[in-house]
Amino acid sequence: MNFMLTLLTNTLLALLLVTIAFWLPQTNVYSEKSSPYECGFDPMGSARLPFSMKFFLVAITFLLFDLEIALLLPLPWASQANNLEVMLTTALLLISLLAISLAYEWSQKGLEWTE
């Protein structure tokens, strides 16, 4: 019962804060406030640098693979548990997921830097 009350309270509080942030208007928005500031001088170049979407996709792919590998790190300590078959099955599933997702990324040309 305490868990459900805590979960309900946290959910309602989060929804309330998101609603307040969404509905409150942003005040005092004018061009001077939203323009880039470069030590009191006019900017020498564009403040908005172009962003490579390919770099973003490779970075997200790296983070996902890094997270999956981090899931494998505690497995040597899990090998000391009573149920070794569950640990080996979990390791096999994680490694299979890594291999399948790597093959998919490779087939979709998601790992190639040039277009």
UniProtKB/Swiss-Prot annotation:
Core subunit of respiratory chain NADH dehydrogenase (Complex I) which is composed of 45 different subunits. Interacts with TMEM186. Interacts with TMEM242. It comes from the Eukaryota. One of its GO terms (cellular component) is mitochondrial inner membrane. One of its GO terms (biological process) is mitochondrial electron transport, NADH to ubiquinone. Disulfide bonds: none annotated. The gene is MT-ND3. This is NADH-ubiquinone oxidoreductase chain 3. Keywords: Electron transport, Membrane, Mitochondrion, Mitochondrion inner membrane, NAD, Respiratory chain, Translocase, Transmembrane, Transmembrane helix, Transport, Ubiquinone. It is a multi-pass membrane protein. The keyword Thylakoid does not apply. It comes from Rhinolophus pumilus. Its EC number is 7.1.1.2. It is found in: Mitochondrion inner membrane. The chain crosses the membrane at residues 3-23, 55-75, 84-104. Belongs to the complex I subunit 3 family. Core subunit of the mitochondrial membrane respiratory chain NADH dehydrogenase (Complex I) which catalyzes electron transfer from NADH through the respiratory chain, using ubiquinone as an electron acceptor. Essential for the catalytic activity of complex I. It catalyses: a ubiquinone + NADH + 5 H(+)(in) = a ubiquinol + NAD(+) + 4 H(+)(out). Pfam families: Oxidored_q4. InterPro entries: NADH_UbQ/plastoQ_OxRdtase_su3, NDAH_ubi_oxred_su3_sf. The keyword Electron transport applies. GO terms for molecular function: NADH dehydrogenase (ubiquinone) activity.
